[in-house]
Amino acid sequence: MALEAAGGPPEETLSLWKREQARLKAHVVDRDTEAWQRDPAFSGLQRVGGVDVSFVKGDSVRACASLVVLSFPELEVVYEESRMVSLTAPYVSGFLAFREVPFLLELVQQLREKEPGLMPQVLLVDGNGVLHHRGFGVACHLGVLTDLPCVGVAKKLLQVDGLENNALHKEKIRLLQTRGDSFPLLGDSGTVLGMALRSHDRSTRPLYISVGHRMSLEAAVRLTCCCCRFRIPEPVRQADICSREHIRKSLGLPGPPTPRSPKAQRPVACPKGDSGESSALC
């Protein structure tokens, strides 16, 4: 999602960003707030959103922000919107939200104003939530500003609070045998910051799920698993496809459009069990 820029912001900007993160963090809700979140089959959930920012190759300024909404549980795209943007803030680890969230927020607000009936009931975000240097990643930031339930879905482990991608961590990953198996990410502080989830039988690389806003970790993990036709949950995957295709068309680049996922590859029914270490969730 992020592309590192050559220069960093001045120290006063970083201090301002830290204060803003601390202010917004006070509004994070890390529990279920909707009835559908507590239902084993997510009854009542009809629309799941995904967001992504893709970059023009070799360009740290030009990018494409994308929002898609999928029907649930069918996982068919019912809304998509992409726009080319010019990024003004540099990439700094731990401050991704200040670079990307303003554009994603605009897309959500546009949908809310123009087609409120298609508003997602939850957003899956390519990035971290409370699994973050200061406990306030991009999924928290977007969740608080939109007041939507948000889930952080990261492809790599953010090594904070003593979490390390060491031999012990790799052994825990090896023990994730089937789709839905997971284990908690317990920091040195004693806090469970997220879960490592095997999201697909054909991928041994886990996803790192964390709370963004207005959703419990248990529900976030179950929902992510229910949204996976492949390793990456479909809302995030389709947002990535949409943004890359928009870049291709906007720049007149050659190549056929990226195919949508086939309907035949739908996830199995949502789980009814509880999450826990190495427990099958779907």
From Swiss-Prot:
GO terms for molecular function: DNA binding; endodeoxyribonuclease activity, producing 5'-phosphomonoesters; magnesium ion binding; RNA endonuclease activity, producing 5'-phosphomonoesters; single-stranded RNA binding. Mg(2+) binds at residues 52, 126. The record marks 91 as: Interaction with target RNA. Changing residue 171 to A: No effect on subcellular location or activity. Its EC number is 3.1.26.-. GO terms for cellular component: cytoplasm; cytoplasmic stress granule; nucleolus. InterPro entries: Endonuclease-V (IPR007581). Changing residue 227 to S: 68% decrease in activity. Gene3D superfamilies: archaeoglobus fulgidus dsm 4304 superfamily. Changing residue 226 to S: No significant effect on activity. Residues 250-282 are annotated as: Disordered. One of its GO terms (biological process) is DNA repair. It comes from the Eukaryota. Its cofactor is Mg(2+). Keywords: Cytoplasm, DNA-binding, Endonuclease, Hydrolase, Magnesium, Metal-binding, Nuclease, Nucleus, RNA-binding. Monomer. Interacts with PABPC1; the interaction is RNA-dependent and stimulates ENDOV activity. Belongs to the endonuclease V family. This is Endonuclease V. It comes from Homo sapiens.
